[in-house]
Amino acid sequence: MNKSEMGQGVYTGLSMIVADELDFPWDRVIVKPAPARDVYIDKKMGSQLTGGSTSVRNMYEFLRLLGASMKEMILESASREWKVPKEKLQARMGYVSYANKKASYGELWEKALKLPIPTQVRLKEPSEFIYIGKGVPRIDTKEKVEGKAIFGIDVRLKDMVYAVVERPPYFGAKVKSVDDSQARQIKDLLDVFTISSGVAVCAKTVEGALKGREKLKVEWTKSPLEGFDDERLSQYYLDMLKKKGVVARKDGNPALVLENTKRKISAVYLLPYLYHATMEPMACIVDVKEDRCTVYAPVQAQTWTLQTAKSITGLPEDKIEVYTTYLGGGFGRKSNVEFVKEALEISKKLKKTVKLIYTREDDVKSGWYRPMNATHLEGALDEKGRVVALYHKIAVPAVFEWAGRPSRVDRAAVEGIENMFYEIPH
């Protein structure tokens, strides 16, 4: 599965699509997370990424074609083996049958794989669906109820050590000096050193790492962001809202309607930076060797994780393995892989398998936050109270800029506005 399961049910939803066209029994469906490789990229996103509630929308057509193509190849395999016209065969619930002959998909699949992929296949009519649009048991329910599901925080590897990071009290600050003399007296502590985001504390136990961090004395450089507060931020965004922006969508002539309407509602809203509050704080396990790298992480962005590992280790992509665990919530936060970068730096320096842990306090203090924004809304109503014109202006940081995808209009900033489902003429 090229999408991350973070409680939204994507393992179940996408499997339903394939299993329906394939005519495969639901109780035999098993899902394995896909490795980070180009072949698993979501073509519509240009990345192996889960986010924006796009998984079913982006994958629906492809997965239906995949399931139907697999069934067609299995039928062709049976047709050749039994020397029976394909039209006379029946594929149902994981078996192909004809007269007194019957074979499972698995028995036919090895030979089917050697056949050319069909260029055209028949997709089911909605009336033929056996899973799509119907209720089925979730694939992940049983192992989660039984406590067998493995999240990022649950992974344990042989001889792994633990690490936590002391990060700056405000964004933009860097380590100026470190006094780790008291920290090094802590039992089980292995090492203390500086990484790009702060000071890493490594120990044989979680307790040792946390106690070691408590004993650190770190001096930080100054940062332009040090004096920022809610009042200054709010005024900054309100000022930005008054400046000219770029137009993401325009229908009709809203300015003219709003100017001449008798019933108009106008409001300005401020939304603060928000903590994502995933149930599972950031955690990952990384093992950097000279000739290979292994990452176990609850990430939404496998492509970015792979690229980060490649950048830190200098290894080619085929020497890097990324295993995606279950995510204890994501909400977009785990598409940022800076916590994986930290673990990569620590493992490379320490030359050991490292489990990096964020406490809840770390996660709140040093997370990536949903962006603050200011919004100006004006709406015109007709005599029946229907919205006939809408003006919606937003001042918000450009998400795609840091993601390396600059554009004139940041689609993430106007998602839900630009493509709204309400029919408003202006």
Where are these regions (language model features)?
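Structural alpha/beta core scaffold segments of enzyme domains
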Residues: M1-H426
